[in-house]
């Protein structure tokens, strides 16, 4: 497989067959997949998530049925769930949102659905709650990297854990550390970079020694590039890619923090915050908002953030409205394409 390529050039990932078998077994146990299960592969199957978490491999291993989706689109996904009596499927947040919008105009019998897995990018708590209510299912958050590590929530977890965390590692042999910029371990509930080693995580990319020198530690931990923290109950929260963190005149801004506040505004249904190159500050803050009934000015957005106690250095420099989000092949919002619109 190739790495996602959302923050750089895709890299070849040397994975073993036994890695995929191991992950499929562990994730089928987490999802209670059995011979009665019907899995809908709604995302492109050349990715870890629909391929084997538990996905196609895990469902077949348990004797269940797999349904393939020709196009990742609500007018393909929702009819298939109804016709094939799908019990489990996986979405990225953007696709989940699009499907829910579609359900406002079209009706389908989705009563067979038991579990919806959501992964691929950060899932905001309000959207997690909405998914459970609209689809009347138990949500399973899943965080994974093509290079190995998989975290998931459990069906028995309470609402707060399912909506606000990405759960725990699937293997008792996964070794996870949260470290600062100097590689020192941070305390519980402190943010840092998630690094990992374990039975199904790679020890380097294929034929890229210069890259491996920067992404593998001396004691063989893989640097995921994800900003995260470990909670007291052992669950993990992932807040985004470290490369997505905006460095504005030396101040660090996490996009998710601003996005969560902006989504509480009555006229904002979907938003992305990205950093743009700036000669004076290094990076400036841009807010992209999906077109709705009313457009807000930059001044209105800034005033709203100030009313929510956002510090001055985190206030955006520009606001731009957009008709539709540019998506990667896996359905993630393509932040690089957003930057190219300026």
Label for each model-derived stretch:
Residues 169-173, 184-215, 253:
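Conserved ATP/PPi-binding loop(s) of AMP-dependent carboxylate-activating enzymes
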Residues 81, 89, 144, 198, ...:
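AMP-binding/adenylate-forming catalytic core of the ANL superfamily
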Residues 2-6, 39, 81, 89, ...:
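Conserved S/T- and glycine-rich ATP-binding loop of Class I adenylate-forming
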Residues 1-22:
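Conserved AMP-binding A3 loop
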Residues 86-91, 100-161, 171, 175:
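Gly/Ser/Thr-rich phosphate-binding loop
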Residues 112, 136, 172, 267-270, ...:
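Glycine-centered tight turns that cap/initiate beta-strands
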Residues 11-14, 41, 64-71, 140:
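Short beta-strand->loop structural element characteristic of the AMP-binding/adenylate-forming
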């Amino acid at each position: 497989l190739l790495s996602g390529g959302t923050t750089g050039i895709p890299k070849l990932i040397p994975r073993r067959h036994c890695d995929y078998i191991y992950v499929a077994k562990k994730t089928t146990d987490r999802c209670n997949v059995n011979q009665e299960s019907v899995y809908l592969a709604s995302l492109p199957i050349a990715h870890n998530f629909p391929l084997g978490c538990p996905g196609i491999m895990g469902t077949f291993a348990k004797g269940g049925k797999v349904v393939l989706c020709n196009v990742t689109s609500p007018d393909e996904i929702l009819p298939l769930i109804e016709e094939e009596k799908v019990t489990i499927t996986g979405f990225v947040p953007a696709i989940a949102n699009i499907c829910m919008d579609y359900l406002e105009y079209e009706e389908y019998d989705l009563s067979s659905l038991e579990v919806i897995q959501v992964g691929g990018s950060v899932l905001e708590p309000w959207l997690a709650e909405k998914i459970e209510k609209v689809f009347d299912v138990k949500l399973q958050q899943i965080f994974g990297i093509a290079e190995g590590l998989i975290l998931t929530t459990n069906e028995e977890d309470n609402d707060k854990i399912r909506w606000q965390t990405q759960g725990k590692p699937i293997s008792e042999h996964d070794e996870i550390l949260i470290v600062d910029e100097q590689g020192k371990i941070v305390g519980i509930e402190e943010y840092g970079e998630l690094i990992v080693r374990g039975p199904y995580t790679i020890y380097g990319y294929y034929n890229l020694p210069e890259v491996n020198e920067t992404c593998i530690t001396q004691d063989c931990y893989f640097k995921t590039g994800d900003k995260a923290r470990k909670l007291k109950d052992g669950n993990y929260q992932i807040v985004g890619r470290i490369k997505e963190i905006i460095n504005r005149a030396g101040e660090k801004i996490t996009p998710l923090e601003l996005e969560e506040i902006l989504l509480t505004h009555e006229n904002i249904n979907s938003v992305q915050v990205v950093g743009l190159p700036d000669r004076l500050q290094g990076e400036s803050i841009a807010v992209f908002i999906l077109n709705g009934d009313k457009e807000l000015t930059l001044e209105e957005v800034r005033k709203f953030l100030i009313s929510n106690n956002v510090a001055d250095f985190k206030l955006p420099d520009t606001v731009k409205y957009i008709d539709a989000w540019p998506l990667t092949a896996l359905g993630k919002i393509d932040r690089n394409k957003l930057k190219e619109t300026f």
